[in-house]
Design a protein with these regions (language model features):
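Short, low-hydrophobicity acidic/polar segments
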Residues: 1-85
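Short, intrinsically disordered, charge-balanced linker/junction segments flanking boundaries
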Residues: 2-3, 108-113
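Short beta-strand element of the conserved SAM-dependent methyltransferase core
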Residues: 59, 102, 111-113
Length: 113
């Protein structure tokens, strides 16, 4: 992967990145996150200097996967789970790419998985 344009490095600088990229987002401290899209939001940071002008970025996941395990135990019926709904969940947030911190936005709601 290569950057869209060459940038001269004249001093030590931090380099930040996020995924999925959107050209409309210009504030690296306020990237919109919407969990209903099921996107794998990621962020990363590295550094460059005059001596080392290429950055190595280690991307981290901004969100967690929730895994639900339902055990049958002694139940003898067919049993079928149609859906699982999480309540009191913030469905959107603003991500600071430089730290990975998420600031919840909007009101809590329900999310049907």
């Amino acid at each position: 992967w290569k950057a869209g344009k060459q940038v001269e490095v004249t001093a030590d600088q931090k380099v930040s990145a996020y995924y999925p990229y959107n050209v409309q987002y210009t504030d690296m401290t306020a990237i919109p996150v919407d969990i209903t899209t099921q996107e794998d939001y990621m962020y990363g940071e590295g550094g460059v200097s005059v001596e080392k002008p290429s950055a190595v970025l280690v991307m981290k996941h901004a969100l967690s996967l929730v895994r639900i395990l339902i055990k049958k135990n002694d139940y003898t019926g067919d049993g079928m789970v149609d859906a699982v709904t999480f309540g009191g969940v913030r469905l959107s947030a603003s991500m600071d790419v430089t730290s990975g911190k998420l600031l919840p936005t909007g009101q809590p709601g329900e999310y049907k998985a």
